Design a protein with these regions (language model features):
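Transmembrane alpha-helices of multi-pass inner-membrane enzymes
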Residues: 120-123, 137-141, 263-272, 277-319
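Helical hairpin unit composed of two closely spaced alpha helices linked by a short loop
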Residues: 235-239
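Membrane-interface "helix-start" segments
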Residues: 252-262
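Membrane-anchoring hydrophobic segments
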Residues: 1-4, 310-331
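Alpha-helical transmembrane segments of multi-pass inner-membrane proteins
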Residues: 5-55, 61-130, 137-141, 150, ...
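TM-adjacent membrane-interface loops and short helices in multi-pass inner/ER membrane proteins
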Residues: 160-220, 224-231
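A membrane-periplasm/extracellular boundary helix in multi-pass inner-membrane enzymes
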Residues: 43, 47-52, 105-110, 127-177, ...
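Membrane-interface catalytic loops of GT-C/OST-like multi-pass glycosylation enzymes that act
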Residues: 66, 111-114, 212-214, 276-287
């Protein structure tokens, strides 16, 4: 029941946002609040690094969820990079890239492999869609060339543990290398999910009607069947198509970066949900549906803003005597 309420909550967030923003000033305040929240969360994450534990979100108690915090950080990182690539001046670009660096630090220390993988389609989307793609390509090449020199030891150890360690190996292999037991357990849950789905292929077992599994697509398939999975994929397709149209429509405007970053963040969430229940997690979905609502209403909001009125300068009209006309001269 409460899982169903969570799904309903996200649509409530979407419709509340769409119906409550009527002018750009409201939009700017809400976006500023979202970005400030991201900055504060990133700083709190950085402060956790000296403890030696995996970085997680604030106020989670003793056992946090680094994977979900990493998903949130990847989503917001995409928005920030979108703003950076669309910035018109060098100081603004530097400011946005500094903000991005602030997010990358705790993202690395979450040690969330799913979140790291989600950054790949995010960067690829920015490379494909942004005219300034060379900046991203250059940054990626530098990271690949010198990453082993400046990457934190815990990050390198996490990578090695996944594929190269000699202990805690599971039954599955990637490229000839056996993966760790954690990844193997996740793959086992997927296999169990498919085995269960075969018994109820069309409508599934209902929400929470099957065992827990950390994979959104498999979970939807098992709980809602083929019909539910088709509806879920259709929803994702409609979100992408709408956002892509908005991105084209707002090209060159002050919201180009937001639309571009949202598309990249959406691509990241698709990858993230392969290894997590991304579209259920409150920490990720509340900002996601908030941003989705903003992207949806942006074209109407920008069009509805009144255009600046031309200045009226008192001057004689052509062919008229003094005081017989006022010519409207645009600034």
């Amino acid at each position: 029941f409460f899982f169903v309420l969570k799904y309903i909550e996200y649509f409530v967030v979407f419709f509340m946002t769409v119906n409550s923003i009527h002018e750009e000033r409201q939009l700017q305040r809400l976006l500023a609040t979202a970005l400030a929240t991201c900055a504060i969360s990133s700083l709190i994450g950085i402060l956790q690094i000296p403890s030696g534990e995996r970085v997680s979100a604030p106020f989670e108690g003793q056992y946090g969820e680094p994977n979900t915090f990493g998903g949130y950080l990847v989503l917001m990182l995409a928005i920030i990079l979108g703003y950076a690539l669309a910035a018109k001046t060098l100081p603004r670009q530097i400011g946005w890239y500094a903000f991005a660096a602030l997010i990358v630090i705790p993202l690395l220390f979450t040690l969330s492999r799913t979140s790291w993988l989600a950054a790949i389609p995010m960067l690829l989307t920015l490379i494909v869609l942004s005219p300034r793609r060379l900046i991203i390509i250059g940054g990626v090449l530098l990271a690949l060339a010198f990453g082993s020199s400046f990457m934190p030891k815990s990050v390198i150890d996490r990578y090695n543990y996944t594929l190269n360690a000699k202990v805690d190996r599971g039954d599955y292999a990637i490229g000839g290398a056996k993966v760790d037991t954690s990844t193997s357990a996740r793959l086992d849950s997927w296999k169990q999910g498919f085995d269960g789905w075969v018994k109820r292929p069309f409508f599934g077992y209902g929400v929470t009607g099957f065992g827990f599994m950390d994979a959104q697509f498999v979970r939807v398939l098992v709980e809602a069947g083929l019909f539910g999975l088709a509806a879920f994929i259709w929803l994702l397709y409609r979100i992408w198509r709408t956002a892509r149209g908005v991105c084209r429509q707002l090209a060159g405007s002050r919201y180009e970066g937001l639309a571009l970053g949202y598309l990249a963040g959406f691509a990241a969430m698709i990858m993230h949900c392969i290894g997590a229940n991304t579209f259920i997690i409150v920490r990720i979905m509340e900002p996601f549906w908030f941003l989705t609502a903003i992207i949806t209403l942006l074209p109407a909001l920008v069009v509805s803003e009144p255009a600046p009125q031309p200045a009226l300068l008192a001057s004689p009209a052509v062919g008229a005597g003094p005081g017989h006309g006022i010519a409207a001269i645009p600034r």
